[in-house]
Amino acid sequence: MDISEIRQKIDANREKLASFRGSLDLEGLEEEIAILENKMTEPDFWDDNIAAQKTSQELNELKQTYENFHQMTDLFDESEILLDFLAEDDSVQEELEEKLAELEKMMTSYEMTLLLSEPYDNNNAILEIHPGSGGTEAQDWGDMLLRMYTRFGNAKGFKVEVLDYQAGDEAGIKSVTLSFEGPHAYGLLKSEMGVHRLVRISPFDSAKRRHTSFTSVEVMPELDDTIEVEIREDDIKMDTFRSGGAGGQNVNKVSTGVRLTHIPTGIVVQSTVDRTQYGNRDRAMKMLQAKLYQLEQEKKAAEVDSLKGDKKEISWGSQIRSYVFTPYTMVKDHRTSYEVAQVDKVMDGDLDGFIDAYLKWRLN
């Protein structure tokens, strides 16, 4: 590595560190660490063991973030000092290159930590697929997305479970709800929230014309026991029905499927996967809690935007990505401009490039 390459690396590292500093409120981080440390000294801190463990984990993660940033800053300062010496003594080059390699390794790891550091990023995820108008073509597109997300989840080692499945009239799906259980499931899948557009020659059109279909995807974090969402029993209407598997297999002779309607908001959720009515009601309640929590967060975000004067489209109601099968092949994310030509790989669950681009776009 010649000196000009070393200078370029140091300049790039300087920019990346500045980006990290811009995304971190160091004073706020110090204050948050102090608050949690004081909280852990309270006499009744360990009375609620689950909450205490969560607080302890949160404190450790914040401390790690703070310490790692300062370690990277120290490494960068050392590399600049060694660069000054390099002009007079080339024997320091090996040490300088080792410092740069160590710094770049730390920055790569740190960047991923920052990308997945928002609230609930480490939670499990609930993902819903709702085809738009367009009949069989749109419902088949929904089924293609179901396959894509299932393959993505399996490749990541997540436990993927179908919570509710409504088959299409001729092919595909009318709607489906999935759960993804594993580290950072929500943090990775939140990039998929929005409307997905398909352009292809429809296999259901005898004239072989090109069709455009739309399907909306909604993603919510599964809430743990430390987050309480109060739901009054009087506000819930419960309906039961006979449920079956995908395509109508294993139709139950008893009404085990559960549909819950939250009367004040009109939100409807249902679960059919469990063999018992009790199990499906429990799953449906978790889905309802997640939806109500998300609704409250969206209201707060809308209030902040109105105070700022921002005019933004509702994220889950806007087109986020196009999948073009003809006259050329391309998948393009309209938020980040990230695109690939290998549409088959994407449909097989290779979403890492899109997720990485989205997380970096949010960070910046």
UniProtKB/Swiss-Prot annotation:
Database matches in InterPro entries: PCRF (IPR005139), Pep_chain_release_fac_I (IPR000352), Pep_chain_release_fac_I_sf (IPR045853), PrfB (IPR004374)
Annotated positions of the N5-methylglutamine modification: 249
GO-annotated molecular function: translation release factor activity, codon specific
Main location, first listed in the record: cytoplasm
Recorded superkingdom: Bacteria
Post-translational modification: Methylated by PrmC. Methylation increases the termination efficiency of RF2.
PROSITE patterns listed in its UniProt record: RF_PROK_I
Subcellular compartments: Cytoplasm
Entry GO CC: cytoplasm
Keywords: Cytoplasm, Methylation, Protein biosynthesis
Functional description taken from the UniProt entry: Peptide chain release factor 2 directs the termination of translation in response to the peptide chain termination codons UGA and UAA.
Cross-referenced HAMAP family: Rel_fac_2 (MF_00094)
Family recorded in the similarity comment: Belongs to the prokaryotic/mitochondrial release factor family.
The protein's name in its UniProt record: Peptide chain release factor 2
